[in-house]
Amino acid sequence: MAQSDALYEMLTGYENLEFFGKMKGVPSDKLKKEIEYVAEIVDLTDDLKKLVSKYSGGMKRRLSLAIALIGSPELLILDEPTVGIDPSLRKNIWKELFKQRDNGVGILVTTHVMDEAELTDKVGLLLNGDIIDFDTPQQLKVKNNVKTIEEVFLKVEEN
């Protein structure tokens, strides 16, 4: 899932999911059910018949995430997946990401939102393109004697 959305604006949300589902090899007999499932995760069920050109920026973001989730991927690479998404939906999306992780899906998330980094199994802190620290969120906080990942970043950045 890229930070800028690569969607077909003149198709509906459903048609975008259908197209990408077929591209990912989702069997025709399972495609409708998968579309319904991912649309529910990102709260787009009621908007699937709308043209994507009529979607708000947040809706497009959620559609891109649904496209990333469709087709039982082995690896999800998500760039800022919940930016601009309301807290309750954000919680639901992370619940799904945890479920995917528990089912063996590898997930790589990039984010500037340190609260999101706290939710991951491992955190790689980058500064000027270099990894300046890498560990579990808890270990990063312990070894830097701070309470949040944001404080870890600020402390490591100083050194």
Enumerate the predicted regions with their spans.
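Conserved ABC ATPase signature
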Residues: M10, L51-Y55
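Conserved ABC ATPase "signature" region
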Residues: E18, K22, D29-D47
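Hydrophobic anchor residue at the start of the ABC signature
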Residues: L65
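Conserved catalytic motifs of ABC-family nucleotide-binding domains
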Residues: S72
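Catalytic Walker B motif of ABC-type/P-loop ATPase nucleotide-binding domains
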Residues: L76-D79
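ABC ATPase "signature
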Residues: F134-D135
